[in-house]
Amino acid sequence: MIQNPQRPVSSIAFPILVALSISHCLNDLLQSVITAVYPLFKDDLGLSFAQIGLITLVYQMSASVFQPIFGLFFDKRPVAWTLPAGMLFTMTGMLNLAFASNLHWVLFSVFLIGIGSSVLHPEASRITSLASGGRRGLAQSLFQVGGNLGGSLGPLLVALLVAPYGRSHISLFAILSLIAILVMIPVCRWYKGYLTRIKSAPAAMKPHLAMPLPMNKTVLSIS
């Protein structure tokens, strides 16, 4: 019996969901490091509150505004290894942040970290849905638990590993990036297998893509 690829999977893939939750935890942990090290940057680089605000703006722009752009792109061209690619951006930004000697370098670093998050979240959410076996509420909850946990652990680790020793110890968080990439490998293999099955399935059984509404209907719906 051929599995209908319009459905996520026939049964919930708990190992994949756990790996995604761990990946989300590590990603959001790394993202939360940025705000936690603001006092260090203010003291070390003599930054004003306005400059600290600029750091936040650049990070939020890259971490939030770019998400739908990447989501739209990967909707049309899904790539199995997107997750580790996003984490590589984050790792590069974290290493740069550890040794940034001026505001421009800091801005470049947080931009890379934000891009990593923008790349990761849309595809991770998609794979979470695919691995849910139809139990999307449970799957999404597991995914969100990881992110919330990571966001709360980041500042604590900064207090333990960075604050007593200096900003250069931010580079230690690159180790967590590598761990996240290792955790993502089985997820990517699973997703690659799914994409392969979709491509090889008969045309009539391939999932139907949602078409955008015409402009007049879109405006009417919003209004």
Q: What positions do the PLM features span?
A:
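Extracytoplasmic
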Residues: 19-39, 47-49, 70
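Helix-loop-helix hairpin linking two adjacent transmembrane segments in secondary transporters
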Residues: 143-192
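Conserved MFS/SLC helix-loop-helix module at the cytosolic interface between two early adjacent transmembrane helices
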Residues: 65-103
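Cytoplasmic helix-loop-helix junction between adjacent transmembrane helices
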Residues: 109-146
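Short hydrophobic/alpha-helical segments at membrane-entry points of transmembrane helices
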Residues: 20, 104-110
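Flexible cytoplasmic inter-helical loops of multi-pass small-molecule transporters
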Residues: 186-212
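Residue-level signature of mid-helix packing/kink "hotspots" within the transmembrane helices
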Residues: 32, 60-68, 151-152
